[in-house]
Amino acid sequence: MSNIADRDPHAWRVPRFFAVAGIAILLTACANSQRMRTMQELQTTADARTVSPAFERYTKQTLLDGLWKRPQLSARDRSIVTLSVLIARNQTVEMPFHFGLALDNGVKPAEISEMIAHLAFYSGWANATAAAEIAGHVFDQRGIGDGELPAADVELLPLNEVTEKQRAEAVQENFGQVAPGVVQYTTDVLFRDLWLRPGLAPRDRSLVTVSALVANGQVAQIPYHLNRAMDNGLTRAEASEVLTQLAFYAGWPNVFSAMPAFKDVLMKRPS
């Protein structure tokens, strides 16, 4: 940072401002760290029982010994769905645990890296920034280096020109005069770049997107992306069980809001 000119009568305020700001940031970081430690302590069985015995029982019996062991969806897919919810809703307290669990369940570091990049577009840059910081700590603890992560620029997967042409024309017709910038970025960055990155399989990329949409109650976008997910290999049984997983991590109201859209898609697709 360049120095303020000595003749500026207010120059002394600048370093003082940054000193105060630095202290404030440090105190905030300490407070956040303490808050995260406190919340993580609440996740222990004893603390959960002390605060809410019912919550502790549901966590152990219904969630961990029940939901996560259901065979209709692999543990890996459950981790992808759950992480997508946490990132999309910026629920950072549980991220360290679930980043670690995802790695244990077979989600590769490269796939987590791509999930964060993908969700920057579908849930916002700030949410992805927060997730990247926490994932970085988990990667460091596990000795995961840059060599295991996708490069910024990669050879993209082949594009289905026919399908993309149909999508682009529909979006241009509907919204080209409303927000041409959004339409242009949607084509150039999302569907001709992001969705073609090979570090996350198209099925999994769709799974991430659908999970984020349900988690944030963005029902209008579900039909397109659920159809795309199933075109990319997600089965009807898996789509159904994704909703079951999401009920616990995104909440029952969001899932019930999404179910009519899921029902409509499933009924219109060939069995």
PLM ranges: what are they?
Residues C30-R76, R89, E94-F97, D104, ...:
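Acidic, glycine/proline-rich low-complexity segments that act as flexible tails and inter-domain linkers
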Residues R78-L86, M95, M115-I116, R205-L213, ...:
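Short, structured motif recognition centered on aromatic/hydrophobic residues
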Residues A75-S79, A110, P202-S206, G217, ...:
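Aromatic- and histidine-enriched alpha-helix N-cap/loop-to-helix transition segments
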Residues H98-A130:
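Hydrophobic/aromatic-rich structural module bridging two neighboring secondary-structure elements via a short loop
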Residues I4-A19:
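Bacterial N-terminal signal peptides that target proteins for export
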Residues N127-A128, Q218, E238-S257:
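Preference for long, well-ordered alpha-helical segments
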Residues F18-T28:
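Bacterial N-terminal signal peptides
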